[in-house]
Amino acid sequence: MTLGRRLACLFLACVLPALLLGGTALASEIVGGRRARPHAWPFMVSLQLRGGHFCGATLIAPNFVMSAAHCVANVNVRAVRVVLGAHNLSRREPTRQVFAVQRIFENGYDPVNLLNDIVILQLNGSATINANVQVAQLPAQGRRLGNGVQCLAMGWGLLGRNRGIASVLQELNVTVVTSLCRRSNVCTLVRGRQAGVCFGDSGSPLVCNGLIHGIASFVRGGCASGLYPDAFAPVAQFVNWIDSIIQRSEDNPCPHPRDPDPASRTH
């Protein structure tokens, strides 16, 4: 393991020890961001246990969502509720659609080195696609992001070390960086100030040029350190696998939308 830092657990019960350790921690909430416009990101998903949000996810087909593998590594998935169409988690919203998890698919997740931190959850039904619930668009297989690409991170969770959990979905402009980053991750940094992803909301998407390029995985040096980049699982490395999982579903003949013209995009 080349990260050179201790791992700390994700869930909110483990936030305080992880903050004190100041080491590598599973991500991610948004620190230093802003409130998203209601339902601006209709593919955004809240994973919940007993009515409480614990991770983010992305709707990639009407009956499949994508998240971080560590989110469900030690969780009774039968108790997980997948909430679509949410914006303010503290309110009852008529836009929501709620499902249970029927099946999970992993791809060689390595919890020690935090590699292949991706999971696909098959829902026990199919979402109704509308203005508030939509399927995300994924990049072409193998497409890499170059240094300096502007992206958007998002999620629900803690707003900082001494602040509470966000009820309203947060978003944050971030920049892709290749230094201090493994090739097995996509990494981002907010230049010039302390902002980024942190505890309480792993699995949330990283949106670059309208495509989901990352799944929030872990941070180093504490939340929003301004020194170490935040690490995301690289979605483009798994697109063929994702397609193969979705296409196996007999009741979902249409997988996620593809990047319509990969050659026209510069990353």
From Swiss-Prot:
Annotated catalytic residues: 70, 117, 202
Family statement: Belongs to the peptidase S1 family. Elastase subfamily.
Superkingdom assignment: Eukaryota
PROSITE patterns: TRYPSIN_DOM, TRYPSIN_HIS, TRYPSIN_SER
Outcome after substituting residue 43 to L: In SCN1 and CH
GO cellular component: azurophil granule lumen; cell surface; collagen-containing extracellular matrix; cytoplasm; cytosol; extracellular exosome; extracellular region; extracellular space
Propeptide feature ranges: 28-29
Tissue spec. comment: Bone marrow cells. Neutrophil.
Pathological association: Cyclic haematopoiesis: Autosomal dominant disease in which blood-cell production from the bone marrow oscillates with 21-day periodicity. Circulating neutrophils vary between almost normal numbers and zero. During intervals of neutropenia, affected individuals are at risk for opportunistic infection. Monocytes, platelets, lymphocytes and reticulocytes also cycle with the same frequency. Neutropenia, severe congenital 1, autosomal dominant: A disorder of hematopoiesis characterized by maturation arrest of granulopoiesis at the level of promyelocytes with peripheral blood absolute neutrophil counts below 0.5 x 10(9)/l and early onset of severe bacterial infections.
Subcellular location: Cytoplasmic vesicle, Phagosome
Single GO MF annotation: peptidase activity
Primary role: Serine protease that modifies the functions of natural killer cells, monocytes and granulocytes. Inhibits C5a-dependent neutrophil enzyme release and chemotaxis. Promotes cleavage of GSDMB, thereby inhibiting pyroptosis. Promotes blood coagulation. Through the activation of the platelet fibrinogen receptor integrin alpha-IIb/beta-3, potentiates platelet aggregation induced by a threshold concentration of cathepsin G (CTSG). Cleaves and thus inactivates tissue factor pathway inhibitor (TFPI).
Subunit comment: Interacts with NOTCH2NL. Interacts with agaphelin, an antihemostatic protein from Anopheles gambiae.
Signal peptide range in chain numbering: 1-27
UniProt-reported outcome of changing residue 262 to L: Found in patients with severe congenital or cyclic neutropenia
SUPFAM superfamilies registered for this protein in UniProt: Trypsin-like serine proteases
Protein name as it appears in the record: Neutrophil elastase
Major site of localization recorded for this protein: cytoplasm
Effect of mutating residue 82 to M: In SCN1 and CH
CDD domains in alphabetical order: Tryp_SPc
